[in-house]
């Protein structure tokens, strides 16, 4: 994972690079990890309804000029916490649109 200001380059298991935009990051004291919500920048990332799939990973930030590392979400408890954070984010976005 490479960091830009608001972009990261994600490399999949096949070695393909994909530019993604960071939606937001947060830290969890309960799990002692940082997390990032991100989505692909390319138009091909949209589904047939025009929706863009958002991904989430734990991450270890890199030092100033070093790459960081994306990590998988490991437990059901982490997924529950992430879902709660996502739902709060979506509710706040909807309130801002009104």
UniProtKB/Swiss-Prot annotation:
It comes from Geobacillus thermodenitrificans (strain NG80-2). PANTHER family: UPF0473 PROTEIN CBO2561/CLC_2432, UPF0473 PROTEIN CBO2561_CLC_2432. Pfam families: DUF1292. Belongs to the UPF0473 family. InterPro entries: UPF0473. This is UPF0473 protein GTNG_2486.
């Amino acid at each position: 994972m490479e960091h830009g200001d608001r972009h990261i380059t994600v490399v999949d298991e096949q070695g393909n690079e994909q530019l993604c935009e960071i939606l937001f990051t947060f830290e969890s004291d309960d799990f002692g990890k940082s997390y990032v919500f991100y989505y692909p920048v390319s138009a091909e990332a949209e589904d047939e309804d025009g929706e863009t799939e958002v991904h989430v990973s734990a991450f270890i930030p890199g030092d100033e000029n070093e790459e960081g590392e994306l990590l998988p979400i490991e437990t059901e408890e982490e997924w529950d916490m992430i879902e709660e954070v996502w739902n709060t984010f979506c509710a706040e976005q909807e309130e801002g649109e009104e």
